[in-house]
Amino acid sequence: MNVIWRSCICRLRQGKVPHRCQSGVHPVAPLGSRILTDPAKVFEHNMWDHMQWSKEEEDAARKKVEENSATRVAPEEQVKFESDANKYWDIFYQTHKNKFFKNRNWLLREFPEILPVNQNTKEKVGESSWDQVGSSISRTQGTETHCQESFVSPEPGSRGRSAPDPDLEEYSKGPGKTEPFPGSNATFRILEVGCGAGNSVFPILNTLQNIPGSFLYCCDFASEAVELVKSHESYSEAQCSAFIHDVCDDGLAYPFPDGILDVVLLVFVLSSIHPDRALFI
């Protein structure tokens, strides 16, 4: 699988200091140079560089870790929670629906590398979001971009928008498998693993709808989460395919052939998987 490096950078010409891809919402800042000097402006960006804890903050964090580790889960309970994890997440989504997590409207501003290069797009964050954001955010990624290298690990021949591969349109030649797969006509494809209620899905779709030939796959091992995505008013099978899938089970098939993805996105996913199972991703 492709992985989006959280430390993605774009290098300017002539060996200048690394910069992130240009964003029309936030000013271009060299990677590592976004320093919080005024605490009153802490919410102006989603993240800040080189934040250092005070001695008091470090001691408080250590105390919390010790408190959390004081009570351990019994081994038999660990097995149950691990084997039935999807069921517990189903209960979570049955209880909280789409109200627990906020939409990641910052995602494409902080990581514009997710989108195809050299695309003119407008990011619309509006009523199609779960949290019904009232305002819309416009951003334009110019055709003369500073980013010459994306550092998003690509599939061979990807990252640009190429012509559709006719061999992919009916990749399943076996009996009963003659239908084109979802997104078979797309030229740029993203997969989000662990989509939950769609808090990354719909901010991304708001932008992808302005990029012809793009398609978004999203999966979760909790069936309730997938149903929440499919029930959203902005969900369209013409540009998105949501499906149930456990990425730790390498015996499960995907609804698309190997080698067609341009970007794979995992947001707060790896940290929730047992290290032993993460080896199968």
From Swiss-Prot:
Region Disordered: start-end pairs: 139-180
Residues involved in S-adenosyl-L-methionine binding: 89, 93, 194, 220, 246
Top-level EC class: transferase
Disrupted-gene phenotype: Mice were born with normal Mendelian ratio without developmental defects. Cells show reduced N(3)-methylcytidine modification in mRNAs.
Cited InterPro entries: Methyltransf_12, METTL2/6/8-like, SAM-dependent_MTases_sf
UniProt main location, coarse: mitochondrion
Protein name: tRNA N(3)-cytidine methyltransferase METTL8, mitochondrial
Organism annotation: Mus musculus (Mouse)
Gene name of the record: Mettl8
